[in-house]
């Protein structure tokens, strides 16, 4: 059966005021590797290897104790050289932490290092020289503190002799190193345990994350038809009745250029000015847009099931006539958002983050529309090129992947919240699998367009485009996770999702002789 065509009369559109700006900022700032997770290795296939200097880069769990009090675990990376760390650790493997003198560890230490873990700072000499000095001083391991909030891969050069280092060599970020050093203030005893847990062969979080992403796209695409309904285009808003007259944001071809420039500037800002306050700014923006999303989704669901709730209104100063539903839902949504913001580092905070994120994306896909595949092609191809450049090409310019560095964040301040995430229950790291909002929203705009196009042209699931694009999105996302598994690193999902969605509708349109109509449509 064909989808009912929308009414020929122009429906009143839902206004969102400030939410448009907030959603746009999140859309531009939500660029993280599409499928990301905490892998046990950092292999990239590029860093040089030489005989005796060919260890895999492994992710290291660095746990430390201050006067017997266990602190949070930190993350490090092993060197190409040195002894390989065990996959498990026990209290018997703990070693006392000692800062060598000099603190860079480039010369024989005046502080005794025997059977300890030397905690040295980066600089003044090579990684290999530091390792040789620490080993000659009797250290059981070397823990290097980087001079920036990132992890540097420690390699050998062609001019280096075969290192033959017999102790583990690990690096931690500057912020992680500061935590260890601060624990040693005042003469406190600090013990360190380092080991490299292996990644489990099965990641049970990925199927659930896949379902959330695919379900979000499907739900948001059909929301206005299934939940809101043609008879009720005026869902409750944060403002009064006049707010409902605002038009839906219809993207144009020039949006692609605006996206490339603005998103790149935002990404570079976060890369060069990576700080606690900038992370908190993004958290605040996420909370505001999440509040809008929660209110919108809850309000439309209530109004859909309760006809009388739609009509109950009260007059408020400035806001005008506001529905009773809004007066009830908005405070509850605000409490939910505030509780999440306060407890965002708790083990179950991901539930609230995912709920706010899904509601926000449903709202975005009701507010922002693609009118045809001409605009879709410009936007998605630009986003595709954006992902490729900032993940794979930027290391040749900035010495590291800008997007991955921003997505990884730092050990200080909150993590970037613009992702759907799911805990990896079977992983020793207790990390998360993630997918960025942009990798749901950009293809979602095209999928939502296909649903509106099918309705406008009286097509059903068998001869329309919506079902095919949903299958294409699901297939592309599956390929993303296959790439994650094979390459052992975060994947730019749009690399797979743009061909599987845009390529699908272009191919089908050409085969059916409807490509010109799709290209110039206005739905």
Curated annotation (Swiss-Prot):
Signal sequence residues: 1-35
TM helices/strands, residue ranges: 208-228, 255-272, 276-298, 322-342, 348-368, 378-398, 431-451, 466-486, 490-510
Any idea what job this protein has? Intramembrane-cleaving aspartic protease (I-CLiP) that cleaves type II membrane signal peptides in the hydrophobic plane of the membrane.
Q: Topology: which residues are Lumenal?
A: 36-207, 273-275, 343-347, 399-430, 487-489
What biological processes does GO assign it? membrane protein proteolysis
Could you say which EC number(s) this protein's record lists?
Answer: 3.4.23.-
Q: How does it sit in the membrane?
A: Multi-pass membrane protein
Q: Which GO terms describe its molecular function?
A: aspartic endopeptidase activity, intramembrane cleaving
- Give the comment on domains: The PAL motif is required for normal active site conformation.
Q: What protein name applies here?
A: Signal peptide peptidase-like 3
* Pfam families recorded: PA, Peptidase_A22B
Q: Which GO terms describe its cellular component?
A: cytoplasmic side of endoplasmic reticulum membrane; endosome membrane; Golgi-associated vesicle membrane; lumenal side of endoplasmic reticulum membrane; lysosomal membrane
InterPro entries to which the protein is assigned, alphabetical? PA_dom_sf, PA_domain, Peptidase_A22B_SPP, Preselin/SPP
Query: Which terms are listed as keywords in the entry?
Result: Endosome, Glycoprotein, Hydrolase, Membrane, Protease, Signal, Transmembrane, Transmembrane helix
- Residues with attached carbohydrate: 159
Domain PA stretches:
110-182
The Swiss-Prot or TrEMBL record describes its family as follows: Belongs to the peptidase A22B family.
Active-site residues, Swiss-Prot/TrEMBL:
387, 439
What gene name does this entry carry?
Answer: SPPL3
Ranges spanned by the short sequence motif PAL, renumbered to the chain: 492-494
Q: Which organism is it from?
A: Oryza sativa subsp. japonica (Rice)
Q: Where in the cell is it found?
A: Endosome membrane
């Amino acid at each position: 059966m064909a989808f009912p065509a929308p009414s020929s009369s122009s429906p009143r559109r839902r206004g969102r005021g400030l939410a448009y700006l907030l959603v746009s900022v999140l859309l531009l700032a939500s660029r993280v590797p599409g499928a990301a997770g905490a892998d046990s290795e950092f292999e990239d296939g590029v860093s040089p290897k030489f005989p005796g200097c060919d260890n895999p880069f492994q992710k290291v769990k660095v746990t430390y104790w201050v006067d017997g009090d266990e602190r949070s675990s930190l993350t490090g990376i092993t060197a190409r050289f040195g002894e390989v760390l065990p996959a498990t650790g026990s209290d018997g493997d703990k070693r006392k932490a000692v800062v060598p003198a000099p603190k860079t560890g480039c010369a024989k230490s005046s502080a005794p290092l025997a059977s300890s873990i030397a905690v040295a700072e980066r600089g003044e000499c090579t990684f290999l020289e530091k390792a040789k000095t620490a080993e000659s001083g009797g250290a059981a391991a070397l823990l290097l503190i980087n001079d920036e909030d990132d992890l540097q891969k420690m390699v050998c050069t062609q001019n280096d002799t075969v290192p033959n280092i017999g102790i583990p060599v690990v690096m931690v970020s500057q912020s992680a190193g500061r935590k260890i050093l601060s624990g040693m203030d005042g003469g406190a005893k600090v013990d360190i345990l380092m080991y490299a847990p292996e990644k489990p062969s099965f990641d049970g979080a990925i199927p659930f994350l896949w379902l959330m992403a695919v379900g979000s796209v499907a739900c948001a695409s059909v929301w206005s038809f299934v939940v809101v309904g043609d008879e009720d285009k005026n869902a409750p808003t944060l403002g009064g009745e006049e707010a409902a007259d605002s038009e839906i944001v219809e993207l144009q071809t020039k949006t692609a250029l605006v996206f490339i420039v603005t998103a790149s500037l935002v990404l570079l800002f976060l890369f060069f000015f990576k700080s606690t306050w900038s992370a908190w700014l993004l958290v605040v923006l996420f909370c505001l847009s999440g509040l809008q999303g929660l209110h919108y989704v809850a309000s439309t669901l209530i109004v859909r099931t309760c006809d009388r709730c739609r009509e109950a209104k009260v007059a408020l100063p400035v806001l005008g006539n506001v529905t009773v539903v809004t007066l009830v839902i908005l405070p509850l949504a605000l409490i939910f958002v505030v509780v999440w913001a306060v407890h965002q580092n708790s083990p179950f905070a991901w539930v609230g983050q995912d709920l706010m994120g899904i509601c926000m994306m449903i709202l975005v896909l009701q507010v922002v529309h693609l009118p045809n595949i001409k605009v879709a092609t410009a936007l998605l191809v630009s986003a595709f090129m954006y992902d490729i450049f900032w993940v794979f090409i930027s290391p040749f310019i900035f010495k590291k992947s800008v997007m991955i560095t921003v997505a990884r964040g730092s050990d200080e301040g909150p993590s970037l919240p613009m992702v759907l995430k799911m805990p990896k229950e079977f992983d020793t790291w207790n990390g998360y699998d993630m997918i960025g909002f942009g990798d749901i929203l950009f293809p979602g705009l095209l999928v939502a367009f296909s649903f509106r196009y099918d309705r406008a042209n009286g097509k059903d699931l068998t001869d329309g485009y919506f079902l095919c694009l949903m299958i294409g999105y699901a297939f592309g996302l599956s390929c993303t996770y296959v790439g994650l598994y094979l390459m052992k690193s975060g994947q730019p999902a749009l690399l797979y999702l743009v061909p599987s969605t845009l390529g699908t509708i272009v191919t089908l349109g050409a085969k059916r002789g409807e490509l010109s109509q799709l290209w110039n449509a206005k739905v």
